[in-house]
Amino acid sequence: MAPDHRPTRSRFRVQPGDPDNGGDARPEQQRRVIGPGSALGICIGSMIGSGIFAVTGQIGPQLVSPLNIMLAWILAGVIALAGALTLAEVAAMRPRASAQYVVVHEMLGPRLGYVNGMITLLIGYLASMAAVAMIAGAYVARLVPDVDERMIATVLLLGLGGVHAATVVGGTRLNDVLVVLKSAVVVLLAVAGFTVTTEPFVPSTSVLEAARLLEPGSVLATVPVDATAAAIDAHLRTAASPPLLSATLGAAIVAVTFAYLGWSNAADVAGEVRRPGRNVPIAIVGSVLLVGSLYLIVNLVYLRVVPPAAMVEVGPDGRLQPMTSIGAVVAERLLGPVGGRLVTGAIVLLLASTLSVAVMTCGRVIAAMAWKGELPAAAGGLNRRGAPTVAIAAQIAASIGIVWITGLRSLLEYVGVLVTLAVVLTMLSAMLLRHRRPDDPRPFRMPLYPLPPLVSIGLGGWLVASAAAEDWIPVAAAAGTLAAMVAARPLLTRPLEIDDIGDHDGASRAS
């Protein structure tokens, strides 16, 4: 019998009014192959990455006191947990690719749904992927001299993209292995921090000289010249700090939110999770609780070893700058020079794990937007194994472009503001979903409703206001990005019709 080459339109549903469908054109060949452990690993693998090994060193000199630093991490965790409880309810109701995008599109309309999806795509994934790849390249360059950091980042992105484009199951297995490795490294650092005795911390001579010469009013500049190590350590730990709940603290929390990015990633692959009504909420909420606890423990180790005011180093221009490798510095003091190099190598593996998860989930966001008509139809193509090949190729190409055209510091400054705005849109949508469809089945119901979304929205607004008060440039850049997204929408979107779908099965097999 000759093969039937007719379009396989029965594989799709285009039912904008169907609450079970969420109004999206979803290909049924997406397979539910991700188990609860892998779903939890996706979130944990996304969250434990570059943030915990960099952010504390960036905010330490700004906040000065250990209490302020711990409060910043706690409040960022509260925001993440409130968002996780809310999103868990939504993702259990709408278990398909990119549940955040689907619910915002459904509740707030296609325009804000598009903005939410583009923020998640461009900022939460593409920009963060490029940043993590660049950091990984820098760490590799510390271990292997005379290598090009950006070339390393490019090779890493291409390799992980190839794995996840080839197979869905292989990608989750790779992530599972890397999550175990990274968790072991973090636990090892935490255990060493509470069991190894260290000497009082004394900044290097170059740091103290730079402080006295270029920043005479700083805490480091007032360190007594002939003081003992214990006296210097005590001087740094008792320095004056900003008041609690100040704009300075709020702006620092914006930076800390970068370390919590990834708690929502199980919702982005909900269409491929087995028993999503049970497993997706476990993954989302469980990852925030587990990773948040680890973050607090690791920060206690950092603060035990290095006073916040001393978390600085001399930059290429001879001026003091926030410490960029707090994890490596602490590991070297706890484990010695050899241990420091081993931890540097382990951090490269951790960053690879973060990138692995981001590549997996970002492709689903692109595909979901294509099925909605918010991106060209070709971006929604799946291969025979159900992986969004075209979307993965597009995200890898975009991230590599970012790696080669911008610097790391300028890339990260405004990420927190835009991601906070995207979370606020999701929280508003979840509240509207409760109001408009109170009788819809909810496999998971968030506790203490409406407190979780209100906490997330309220604290999110405070963070944006604090960031603007401290430095208006990141907020202005975020506003410009939003304007550009809205302006570009007519060029990227298309009317979604049955005829637009075509022979998706044949197209995906050719990809």
Task: Map each language-model feature to its residues.
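Membrane-interface "cap" regions at the ends of multi-pass membrane proteins
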Residues: 1-57, 61-66, 81, 85, ...
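Helix-loop-helix connectors at the membrane interface of multi-pass transporters/channels
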Residues: 4-5, 10-18, 101-111, 133-153, ...
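Hydrophobic transmembrane alpha-helices that form the core helical bundles
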Residues: 58-61, 71, 81-165, 170, ...
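Membrane-interface loop-to-helix entry segments
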Residues: 137, 150-212, 261, 284-288, ...
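C-terminal membrane-solvent junction of multi-pass transporters and transport-like membrane proteins
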Residues: 160, 174-177, 378-389, 423-472, ...
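Hydrophobic alpha-helical segments and their helix-loop junctions in multi-pass secondary transporters
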Residues: 181-234, 301-306, 428-440
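A generic transmembrane alpha-helix motif of multi-pass inner-membrane proteins
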Residues: 197, 227, 234, 413-414, ...
